[in-house]
Regions:
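Periplasmic peptidoglycan-binding/tethering modules of Gram-negative envelope proteins
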Residues: 1-78, 152
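Periplasmic OmpA-like peptidoglycan-binding domain that tethers envelope proteins to the cell wall
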Residues: 82-152
């Protein structure tokens, strides 16, 4: 019984430490995501990705520069970057790909002078498509990083 209690305590300590590390890295944990209130603002544009890629496309750099300019003019604002995928691939793969997309977007904004502690990331994988159709056009719209302002 003592061994079982020690094991459970160690597991709980490990879970708490993992949550702390995720928060430190700016990755939004499910608990934080539920508690955060966010809103979309028209000044922050979404960017899109090529199939199975997480690198920033040339056509996204101008959008990210505008987003960075707006953030520099609004220094008290924190944002959440959501990584999204199309429906192709497994749910697990797409969650990881969405996270890579959100993180590459975050890193690019940091390279433009935005402080890392103002940017949080979360992946929704394929769970929140903006176009539910099953076509290349729909898939290309769904492969995106979406920006929200954290209001609370």
């Amino acid at each position: 019984k003592a061994e079982e209690e020690a094991r459970l305590k160690a597991e709980e300590e490990k879970r708490v430490e993992e949550e702390r590390l995720k928060e430190e890295e700016g990755e939004i944990t499910p608990q934080v995501a539920r508690e955060a209130e966010t809103k979309a603002v028209p000044q922050l544009g979404d960017i899109h990705f090529d199939f199975d890629k997480s690198d920033i496309r040339a056509d996204s750099r101008e959008i990210l520069q505008k987003n960075a300019d707006w953030l520099q003019n609004n220094p008290d604002i924190k944002i959440q970057i959501e990584g999204h995928c199309d429906e192709r691939g497994t749910a697990e793969y797409n969650l990881a790909l969405g996270e890579r997309r959100a993180m590459s977007t975050k890193k690019y904004l940091i390279s433009l002078g935005i402080s890392a502690d103002r940017i949080y990331t979360i992946s929704y994988g394929e769970e929140l498509p903006i176009d539910p159709n099953h076509s290349e056009d729909a898939w290309s719209k769904n492969r995106r990083a979406h920006f929200l302002v954290i209001t609370k």
